[in-house]
Amino acid sequence: MKVIGLADSELESSLRKAGIGMSASEARSIASILGRDPTLAELFCYDAMWSEHCSYKSSRAVLREFLPTEGPNVVLGPVEDAGIVSIDDEWCVVISHESHNHPSQILPNEGAATGIGGIVRDVNCMGARVVATADPLRFGDPYGRESSRVRWVAEGVVDGIWQYGNALGVPVIAGDVVFSRCFDYNCLVNVVAIGVVRRDEIIRSRAPPGSGEKGYDVILIGKPTDSSGLGGVIFASDTLREEEEEANRGAVQIPDPFLKNVLFKANEDLFRLVREKGVEIGFKDLGGGGLTCASSEMGAAGGYGMEIDLDRLHVAGEFPPEVLCIAETQERFLIIAPRELRERILKIYNEDWDLPNVYEGARASVIGRVTTHDRYIVRHRGEEVVNVPIKHLTGGIRYERVWRPRIRNLVEPDVRMPEDLNRVMLDMLASPNIASREHIYRYYDTEVQGNTVIRPGEADAGLLAPIRERDFGIALSVDSNPFYGRISPYWGGATAVAEAMRNVAAIGATPSTLTDCLNFGNPEKPEAFWEFRESVRGLADAARNLWLKGHPNQPVPIVSGNVSFYNESPEGAVDPSPVIACVGIMRDISRAITMSLKEAGDGLYLLGPRFDELGGSEYYRLIWGVTGANVPVVRFPLERSMIYTVIDAVDREILRAAHDISNGGMAITAAEMCMLSDHGISIDISDLGDMRSDKLLFSESSGFVVEVADGAEQEFVSIARSYDLNPVRLGSVSTGDIEMARDGKMLVRLDPEEAREAWSSGLREAMR
């Protein structure tokens, strides 16, 4: 394709007509390296590999500057498809975190389903058994001007997740959902998957050492390649425009969970074969960027070149080479294996698991080889259509983006004290951002595989016991608050980390690792890039300062993640949304607790003082229609002490329930502990300071409300004080109403059934 000698305007026009999204300067850079005009197929390959989605060209420098990715428990950091941390000397947990935002806004069902499909492949290709997923979701205002579209998107996304996940047989054990007008035109569908693998059975997503010298085979398995998902990574690296919606539908992939299920079982046989033979293979899923991305990255990661013959692909029709290279057809993996295993591998997929009869055209095919040269070469019908330096293709391009603080001029509102706090409580319990998520997770098979210990909605984190002969469990939580990010991207990032860790601690698990999915607007806009940079700085500071328990001054490592830019439309960008997942390890699952109250007469304690921090709170936004300015901040030593106190108290079996304080503040936290129990509460906030009662009740400063077993209160206070905390006894669990008093005056008295009805119906009504 002509590049050299064209004026910028001519070149840009030529690129767009060909369906290529790169800039004229990027095309010129490619031509300069090659010393010639690139072929059309080469430009398509570079367009995918140099996209924001694949290359991290705007974000990589910031991530490297700030994020802590190493720690004493890290086995594999964020260099391949998933991160790995140790559980003990034998077992490891594998985790990956991705986004599928743009596809889910255009085709909600297919977009969400393929998001789940892609993330479980990322974990499986490390040799792991996939044991759970999580789904942090962000939708527009269900009562706003785009309510019909918002509800259509939300319903489609939930359907896509449960239809794919249930058919695949992987439980959803965690997730959250936030509704805000800023997501009207850009929903966020982030997905997390975790798996388990023995340390000595980990498989890497790279060409193994010696594979180039020995000419290892490259084997493609799964669905026949078609044109579905073509340009998906380019589509994900641009701003959504309503007038282009129909044209973008082709960039959304088509899922097939039943084929995926068979592939996972066949992969187990592959892993068994590899162990028996004592050989190392490379294994990688085909996601964004398709065949070109998977094959070139595997070759480059191993320090080798790659030769691919497109005529040997199993395909679903006639397609030009550029389509075969970058189409994002789902349910595919790539294997790099010794030639002597070729026939055994082909037999596993084509005969033992009979892929051609599971899905028309599906199979395993040898499509190329690893080489010792440094080129990425693709042939089609006997001709070279791609011949480029492999490290140049995979190395991407880097931009030093300009950043400039966004000035919002936010102020604290002067609101009056509500006359009827009962009404305020009921309205907040019914808010779509607080109400029970049962309307969503009732569709999910949360107990498939039989490993689930704590299901979604029962506690702040999900918990499963994936290894039957072991006592340990794996906890998972996901968190982010875009309303905090709107006020302060830095504290939005820090609070997301802190809350994710609190949620894991609330069941008694010890935070072990973090992942991030960073959802922001256009990085070419200085204010948007500043928001991104500040959020990363905030979450990194929290990870560094909250520490791995038992390892002072060691950060909680961030081992996997994703950056999703261009989450904006002509109406504007989404609020800064760094979504954090936290994995925790529970050494003895029999000691885990939930959030529901257990015994009348038990003491209720508050950990964490209340501050005048209602900026971005549900109280300000829902009741008064304002944002505020005093966003919750993370006081790192205090936060660390609260988390450690709860973990130790659960381990000593003196806590019966715990719930972290976040959306809605202490009052909503305490009321939610009644929702799944037959108990009420009687608490008094007289000893909490001089702030006005509504601020004490609804401030979203971090903390916990915990139920302490009768007779164990002194021991609990002793644990807390060992961490320099002064827990406050709020009151006790009762058999009556939800009561909150101050200085002899009853502030709140709610019938638990009335409160439960508001809480259980809020999300159902919003999505009706």
Swiss-Prot record:
EC number, as in UniProt: 6.3.5.3
Any one GO cellular component localisation term in the record: cytoplasm
Catalytic reaction(s) noted: N(2)-formyl-N(1)-(5-phospho-beta-D-ribosyl)glycinamide + L-glutamine + ATP + H2O = 2-formamido-N(1)-(5-O-phospho-beta-D-ribosyl)acetamidine + L-glutamate + ADP + phosphate + H(+)
Annotated residues for binding of Mg(2+) 2: D122, D285
Residues reported to bind Mg(2+) 1: E98, N562
InterPro entries (UniProt xref): PRibForGlyAmidine_synth_PurL, PurL_linker, PurM-like_C_dom, PurM-like_C_sf, PurM-like_N, PurM-like_N_sf
UniProt pathway annotation: Purine metabolism; IMP biosynthesis via de novo pathway; 5-amino-1-(5-phospho-D-ribosyl)imidazole from N(2)-formyl-N(1)-(5-phospho-D-ribosyl)glycinamide: step 1/2
Biological process according to GO: 'de novo' IMP biosynthetic process
A Pfam family annotated for this UniProt entry: FGAR-AT_linker
Record bears the keyword Plastid: no
Active-site residues, record numbering mapped to chain: H53, H100
Main location group: cytoplasm
Assembly, per entry: Monomer. Part of the FGAM synthase complex composed of 1 PurL, 1 PurQ and 2 PurS subunits.
Function, in words: Part of the phosphoribosylformylglycinamidine synthase complex involved in the purines biosynthetic pathway. Catalyzes the ATP-dependent conversion of formylglycinamide ribonucleotide (FGAR) and glutamine to yield formylglycinamidine ribonucleotide (FGAM) and glutamate. The FGAM synthase complex is composed of three subunits. PurQ produces an ammonia molecule by converting glutamine to glutamate. PurL transfers the ammonia molecule to FGAR to form FGAM in an ATP-dependent manner.
Alphabetized PANTHER family for the sequence: PHOSPHORIBOSYLFORMYLGLYCINAMIDINE SYNTHASE SUBUNIT PURL
Stated name of the protein: Phosphoribosylformylglycinamidine synthase subunit PurL
Organism per entry: Methanothrix thermoacetophila (strain DSM 6194 / JCM 14653 / NBRC 101360 / PT)
